[in-house]
Structures are given as C-alpha cells and as structure tokens.
C-alpha cells in the first residue's frame, strides 16, 4: 500500500511517500515563512522525482496540530483536497503523538512540547512503560508542566524543535516517519470533511471576540 504522509504543523515540512512502512522518498526541511509558498511545490517535486502521481496513493496520514495555526491549515487543506478529489482514505494524528512515537523511548517518560508563546506550550506526558498519556495534550504553562515533570523523577526525555525557557535539556525532534506510519496506518480512515484542526487553543483574534 502506498501512503502519503504530511506534517506542516510547524515551520518545517515533513512529508513522505511510503510503501507500507518503507520510505520511498521523504522531505524534512525547515521552510519558516516560505512554508505556505513552497510546501505544495516541494510535494509535487517529490512525486515527480519518483515517477509517481496522486493516483498511486492509497492512504493519506496527516498531522492536524497543535502547532502553527497557519501551518496546520496548510497541511490539512492539501491533505483534505487530495483525499476528496481522489477518494483516498485519510487518517489524522496529532503532532504531539507523532513526536512521542519518534522519541527514544529508553526513558520512562516522554514529554513532547511545542512553543505556544508567552511561556506556554502545547504539551503532553507519555508513560513509555504503560504505553499511555498520563498528562493529556493541552495548552499549559511551562512552569506547570515542569512541576508535573519533577514529580516523575529524572528518567524523562523532553522533545521539541523550539527554544523553550527551560533548564531541561531538550532532544531535537526529527520525525521517524516510518515508525509513525507503522503505528497509525491501520487506524480507520475518515471522510475528509470530518478532518479537524487540533489547535488546543483559540487564535488571539478568536479570544478577543
């Protein structure tokens, strides 16, 4: 089964074409403000370079946030449009779950965190021993998050691509797309119109209404 994976929830483009869990081609590139203008071009180039087109794809896996509001919208728009036009099943996964799946789980706990500004993050705490989130995904202050982390001891890995105001050492997030796909590919696909952004927090404009 050929699978198209897409994550534009940060200032990076993470995308790949896979045959089941084997990566055929992938892009892991920091695009910053060029993400909106270059993402689709890079994706089209990836398909072209591998002599493939969207008709070859049988499943789409898209990251639906949290993260950059603009980035999340870009990825969901691309994935939903392809899914609808080509009638391809689509699976959504949160960015925090993708980060957790890509972590080095030799530690007891994994803490994926995404900068939400003003000393807040989108974060969760995953128990690698019992295989469950003990702190669900949420918008949380760094101080509150790290107070919870201190209660768990030192066997923790903190993952982020952002510069956070913390004394903890941070492991850079580099997605293991093959492993992410392996863990989610058998989930039931949904109608593209049912795919929702997982913002966890309203935009400032919405908060001020």
Description of each model-found segment:
Residues 1-62:
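N-terminal beta-alpha supersecondary unit
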Residues 1-22, 91-209:
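Oxyanion-binding and handling regions
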Residues 30-41, 69, 73, 77, ...:
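Residues at secondary-structure transition points
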Residues 43, 78-82, 100, 184:
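Buried hydrophobic packing segments
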Residues 59-95:
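DPxDG-like acidic metal-binding loop motif
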